[in-house]
Curated annotation (Swiss-Prot):
Gene Ontology cellular component terms for the protein in this record: cytosol
Entry's localization field: Cytoplasm
Protein name in UniProt: Probable transcriptional regulatory protein FRAAL2138
GO MF entry, a single one: DNA binding
Annotated GO biological process: regulation of DNA-templated transcription
Amino acid sequence: MSGHSKWATTKHKKAVIDARRGKLFAKLIKTVEVAAKTGGGDPAGNPTLADAIAKAKSQSVPNDNIERAVKRGSGELAGGVNYENITYEAYGPNGVAILVECLTDNRNRAASDVRVAITRNGGTVADPGSVSYLFNRKGVVLLTKAAGLTEDDVLLAVLDAGAEEVNDLGDVFEVISEATDLHAVRVAAGDADLEITSADISWLPSVSVPLDAEPAAKVLKLVEAVEDLDDVQNVWFNGDISDDVMELVSS
């Protein structure tokens, strides 16, 4: 996507579709469990866990499920799984760069499944480092655009927490920060009574590839096929899809 705004808009629209998928809960729970295992089960002392719990709750994951995931991760409950973070790099139709983030307990299965999904949909798995340099790891917070709320209001609320820029995306405000400042920005926004739509570590493209309707449809088909895999947590790509093209593809 060209710049941050179009990328966030596309992710925001896709999130509406993704939310209908039954696999979303499982992926969010896995993130909570891994965060608890890595940094402990107390969200007050583990910002990554606090963010994972907040995201799970925002998607209506039941509290009991979240609590069990925290306990499995922290060792209070048996049944915890050793998940591994793996990122795969690929090229899709029209040379679009793709990053695939996985949390898996079976590296061989994840690699095979990702490769098959990519190649069957017109893509090619790339060597490590050949794609990732086209992206920057950032924190992205989306805020509901309440009546009377301006970009300046948002910037004032989150600037001291590490916000780098605020963008007006139409129905939401997007706040960009360093990935390490995501939690602080989310907390600052909450303290200012701003309604948080989402808060995620994101790979934002520094170089984009403009896509018309036909290649956009092919790229999105590939992305959705990869996202459907159980081991896949996130898929990022640098296709620049305008609102008009997105409407054509979605219709």
